[in-house]
Amino acid sequence: MSRYRGPRFKKIRRLGALPGLTSKRPRPGSDLRNQSRSGKRSQYRIRLEEKQKLRFHYGLTERQLLRYVRIAGKAKGSTGQVLLQLLEMRLDNILFRLGMASTIPGARQLVNHRHILVNGRIVDIPSYRCKPRDIITTRGEQRSRALIQNYIDSSPHEELAKHLTFHSSQYKGLVNQIIDSKWIGLKINELLVVEYYSRQT
C-alpha cells in the first residue's frame, strides 16, 4: 500500500488532528469518528482508526508500519511504547518536532533533496533512526538555510519536546535522549495499534 497523497482535510475529519500530516484542525462538529452508519463503532473499527491515525501522522506505508510493529515486538519493554519511540526518532519526524519543517512530508522533502546533515554528514534517508547526542544541521548553502528559515518563520512556536534542543540562529538541533512517552506529538492509544496487528496474524 502506497503512502497517502490525497486530500488531507478528509483524513483529519475522519481521524482527528494529525499534526504531522497537516497543521489544519477539523472544525467543531465536522469530526466523523463518532458518526458511523450504525451509530456505534465496532472494536475492530476503533483499532483500525488508531492504526490509520499513526500511519497518516508519520506518513508511512502499511508495509513500513508493519515492519516497525514487528521490530518493536522483538524489543524489551512495552511494544506500544517502543513502537512510538521508533517512529519519533525517525529523522523526518525529528526535523518536524524541531520546527525545521511544518509537516513530516515537508521534512521528508528536505532530507530527500539532501539539505540535511547528521553529525556533519549528509543523510538523505528520511527513516534514518536518530540517536542521543546526534546533531542535526542544514547544509551551508544559502538555499538550504532559506528553506529552513521559511519553515521556522511560518511554524507556530510551540514548546519543544524535552528530548530535543534547537538553536535557530545556527539552524542546529540536538537529540538529547530517547523521547519520553508524554512528549509524543500525537494523541494516540498505541496499544490498540498493537492489538490491531496481533489480530491480523
From Swiss-Prot:
One of the primary rRNA binding proteins, it binds directly to 16S rRNA where it nucleates assembly of the body of the 30S subunit. With S5 and S12 plays an important role in translational accuracy. This is Small ribosomal subunit protein uS4c. Residues 89-150 form the S4 RNA-binding domain. Its main location: plastid. GO terms for cellular component: chloroplast; small ribosomal subunit. The gene is rps4. HAMAP family: Ribosomal_uS4_B. It is found in: Plastid, Chloroplast. Belongs to the universal ribosomal protein uS4 family. GO terms for molecular function: rRNA binding; structural constituent of ribosome. Keywords: Chloroplast, Plastid, Ribonucleoprotein, Ribosomal protein, RNA-binding, rRNA-binding. One of its GO terms (biological process) is ribosomal small subunit biogenesis. SUPFAM superfamilies: Alpha-L RNA-binding motif. Residues 15-43 are annotated as: Disordered. It comes from the Eukaryota. SMART domains: Ribosomal_S4, S4. It comes from Liriodendron tulipifera. Pfam families: Ribosomal_S4, S4. Part of the 30S ribosomal subunit. Contacts protein S5. The interaction surface between S4 and S5 is involved in control of translational fidelity.
